[in-house]
Structure formats: structure tokens, C-alpha cells
Amino acid sequence: MTYLSQIEALLFVAGEEGLSLRHLASMLSLTPTALQQQLEKLSQKYEKDQHSSLCLIETANTYRLVTKEGFAGLLRAYAKTPMNQSLSRASLEVLSIVAYKQPITRIEIDDIRGVNSSGALSKLLAFDLIREAGKKDVVGRPHLYATTDYFLDYMGINHLDELIEVSAVEPADEEIALFRTQD
């Protein structure tokens, strides 16, 4: 194993936090000066290699492996895809409500959840899991939301009727006993 491959492996595992010069030097039993030379070689290797997406950066004596600037657009698009970014519990709740009650307004969703759902709706719209499906014919004409074809693909189903059936949940006996009034 070369020093370059060892440095690369350590920085890869360290991820976003990176490693300090002192920590790297102690792990590799190198002097700071010798390590600096190895880091410079690694940095030059990445700069010259057009087939590598990586580069080495140093911030306040901490070194990290990051992707080259030219990949920013590609990585931004990747990060926005639902398959590669987990949905929050709130987003999953809203998505479930829309899937089973569509078309439905934000206010109706808020009433079911008991909290504001605007943020979750925005995220689901951005991920193309839901869409605006017209306006409700009431005062204020609020938007109606429904799932998209992409939602069906994401869930691995062909039709909404393939969603699992949700029955009204019966409260457990312990819960019923808890809320009984004692005379």
C-alpha cells in the first residue's frame, strides 16, 4: 500500500468531516512535512486525472476528498430525486393522505394531520410524487392535490386500487380503559 492510497482511503472513510494534518500524520507515522508532500502529490494526481471526479481540499488544516466543481449540476440533480433522498415522516404522512383521499386540498390534509402541511406538499410537488389536480369549487378555490404516474412507479404499482387497504384502526382495550371515567 502506498501512502497515497492510504491517505485516499482514510479521507474517503472520514467523509465530510475530513481529517486534520496532525491526525493523518499520526495514523501514517509520517512527519507533517512528509505528509504535506504526499498530500500535494495526491492533489496533483486528482487535478491531472480527467477520469476522476475527485479533488483534495484543505480548510483550516483539515483535508477532505470532494467532487470536482464540474459535477455540481449532476450531483444537484441526483440529490433532488426521491429515490436518493429520503422523505420525512411528515412528507410520508401527507403522501399517504393524498394517495388515499385524492383529490384533496391542503386544508383538508391539515385537518387530518392537525398541523400545517405546506412544506411537505412543496417537497412532494418538487419530487413529482403529487400534482395540482385542479381547484375545489368552494370559496377561495383551493388547489386539489393528487398523486402522479411517477408516484405509481415509485410505489411499484400500476393503479391506485393496488394500494393496500386501510381499515379504521380500533383503539386497544388499554386505551379504552384509560379514557373511561370512573364514578
Swiss-Prot record:
Question: What Gene3D superfamilies does the annotation carry?
Answer: Winged helix-like DNA-binding domain superfamily/Winged helix DNA-binding domain
Q: Which GO terms describe its cellular component?
A: cytoplasm
Cite the entry's keywords alphabetically: Cell cycle, Cell division, Chromosome partition, Cytoplasm
UniProt-annotated location(s)? Cytoplasm
Q: Which GO terms describe its biological process?
A: cell division; chromosome separation; DNA replication
Domain of life, per the record?
A: Bacteria
Q: Which Pfam families match?
A: SMC_ScpB
Enumerate the SUPFAM superfamilies for this protein.
Winged helix' DNA-binding domain
User: Transmembrane ranges?
Assistant: none
Q: What is its main location?
A: cytoplasm
What does the subunit section of this Swiss-Prot or TrEMBL entry state?
Homodimer. Homodimerization may be required to stabilize the binding of ScpA to the Smc head domains. Component of a cohesin-like complex composed of ScpA, ScpB and the Smc homodimer, in which ScpA and ScpB bind to the head domain of Smc. The presence of the three proteins is required for the association of the complex with DNA.
- What does this gene product do? Participates in chromosomal partition during cell division. May act via the formation of a condensin-like complex containing Smc and ScpA that pull DNA away from mid-cell into both cell halves.
Which family does the entry's similarity section mention?
Belongs to the ScpB family.
Q: What is this protein called?
A: Segregation and condensation protein B
Q: What species is this protein from?
A: Streptococcus pyogenes serotype M12 (strain MGAS2096)
